[in-house]
Structures are given as structure tokens and as C-alpha cells.
Amino acid sequence: LAFFVIVSASIELGTLPITSSVADNTDTFGLVIPILFFSLMALNYVAVEMLDLDVNEMMRQQIESKGSNRVLFENLLSFLVFLAGLLLWVKYVHKQPIKTLTTSREKVDLSRFWFAFALVAIFNIGITVLDYYSNPQDYVFNFQWEPFLYLLLISVFLIPIQTSFEEYFFRGYLMQGIGVLAKNRWIPLVLTSVIFGGLHYFNPEVTKLGNIIMIYYIGTGFMLGIMTLMDEGMELALGFHAANNL
């Protein structure tokens, strides 16, 4: 049902800003992005289940052969393609400026982004420092300059791209489309939040910590969605998500 609503909403999103030259093909245009994304997710899941693949073991072997930084780089690089594809699709197919996908304000408010980023970064650093002094036995000092610098570069440049894609796709593209179809804010908030959290079900930590961790992921989706709707823009959500993942 959620997939049907998302597809329908994407079609609806396409009907608003598209010019008459492509309006006759709106159905096709509206279907492409959600079908491609969710088909990739479904194909990945089916392949893992049918081939009985041990994803954690495969990841461990890749890290042993390539190194953790290279594996992280390769995994994050795909989000650069996803983000560029989504933004180009919105700009040239839906004929919408990227600003309208980002905010309802006259221009993107970067101060909001940096406020949320700084707030979350300071909180996370503070919690980590507090935990370090409270439980020093849980930490091992293993600082190495070269791997650290590579990790720093990868994180600073690619993790914000990963989080930006997720925000633009869920809180931008899908939330706007579902909102147009549903004509209210609750349905897009609930659907995008649950699906956003649900996609994290395949993360390795879910296997280790159990399904209870899904409350955190879905709850985070709700919080980011509420931020976007109440502030009428994605700047706060973009800053929060980037700092949280970093």
C-alpha cells in the first residue's frame, strides 16, 4: 500500500511543475524515481535471501582485503550518483528549481543548516566525552594519522552527500508528492518516516541489537519529518542528519 501511494504521489508531483511539452508523459516520469529506488532495494533483499548470503561476513572479507576506508568510500560513492540523479531529474524533468524542493523560503537558509549541525555535533561530542570519562575501559586508543586523514576526508565530503540524498528523497521528493496527493501533512509524515526507518532494517546493528533499534530509526524519521513540515524547509533536517551521521 505504501509503495502504491508513493508511486501515485510521485506521479502527482510530476503533474504540477512539468511543462506542456512533457505533460503527456507525466505518468512515466513520475514512476521512474520511486520504481528505480525501491526496485534496487527489493532486488538487493531478494538476492541476499535467495542466495543465502551472509552480508556481515562478506563485509568483513571486503574490509580485510581492501581496508575499511576504501570499503566506506565505495559504499558512499553510490550516493553521489543517487543525489545527482535525483536533483537533475527534479530540475530538468519536473522543471522545478532545487530551491523549491529544499525550502518554501525565498532562498535556502544556510544559517538554519549550520545551527542544527552545530547543535547535534556539540551534543554528540559532549556525550562521547562524558561516556569516555565514565567508562574508560570501553575505549582503546588506536590513533594512526594516515588512516585517520583518509577517513576524515571521506567523512567530510561523502557522508553529507549520503544524508542529503536521504533527506531530498524522503523529506523532499516523496513528502511533497504524497502531500499533494493526500492534501494533508499527516499521511506524508507517517509514510515517509516509517519507510525511512524500515529501510534501516537491513543495517548490521539491527542483527546485533535486535528489532527494538527500529524504534530509533522510525522515530528519527518522524523527528526529521516534523522539523521539515513545521519549519517549512529542509535546512534543519539536512544539518541534523549530516552531523548525526558524522
Give names to the regions the model predicted.
Residues 1-31, 145-178:
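Contiguous N-terminal and early-domain "leader" segments and peripheral loops that mark the onset or edge
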Residues 1-97:
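N-terminal, membrane-interfacial amphipathic/helix-forming hydrophobic leader that caps
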Residues 4-5, 30-41, 76-84, 116-128, ...:
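Alpha-helical transmembrane spans of integral membrane proteins, capturing the lipid-embedded, hydrophobic core
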Residues 6-10, 39-47, 81, 85, ...:
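Alpha-helical membrane-inserting segments
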Residues 9, 13, 17, 42, ...:
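Membrane-interface elements of multi-pass transporters and channels
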Residues 27, 31, 107-121, 186-187, ...:
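Interfacial aromatic "cap" segments that immediately flank transmembrane helices
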Residues 34, 152-246:
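Transmembrane helix-loop-helix hairpins at the membrane interface
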Residues 58-69, 74-76, 98-165, 175-176, ...:
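Juxtamembrane helix-loop-helix connectors linking adjacent transmembrane helices
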